[in-house]
């Protein structure tokens, strides 16, 4: 199980990303439309103003049950070993059992 502080930090990053998503998207559109390099630098400075944790690249997918940040399956939102346990216990509908 991941530490509660790490899970909380990840949720905080998700909130920040949602908050600043429109600002980042509009700034990127402006940069692509403007041909002047000096104006692009000004807009790029505006793009750097939101907090670092609001960048979408800083987000991690985490396992819903354990909070583990690695070996996650996007379709299920679970880490590998939890997914395997749930499939063997027939808790995931549509998933077939196999040993790997």
From Swiss-Prot:
UniProt KW keywords: Chloroplast, Plastid, Ribonucleoprotein, Ribosomal protein, RNA-binding, rRNA-binding
Localization terms from the record: Plastid, Chloroplast
Family assignment from sequence similarity: Belongs to the universal ribosomal protein uS14 family.
Pfam families to which the protein is assigned, alphabetical: Ribosomal_S14 (PF00253)
Record function comment: Binds 16S rRNA, required for the assembly of 30S particles.
An annotated Gene Ontology molecular function: rRNA binding
GO cellular component, one term: small ribosomal subunit
Quaternary data: Part of the 30S ribosomal subunit.
InterPro entries attached to this UniProt entry: Ribosomal_uS14, Ribosomal_uS14_bac/plastid, Ribosomal_uS14_CS
Source organism (scientific name): Olimarabidopsis pumila (Dwarf rocket)
Gene3D superfamilies recorded: 1.10.287.1480
GO biological process, one term: translation
Record protein name field: Small ribosomal subunit protein uS14c
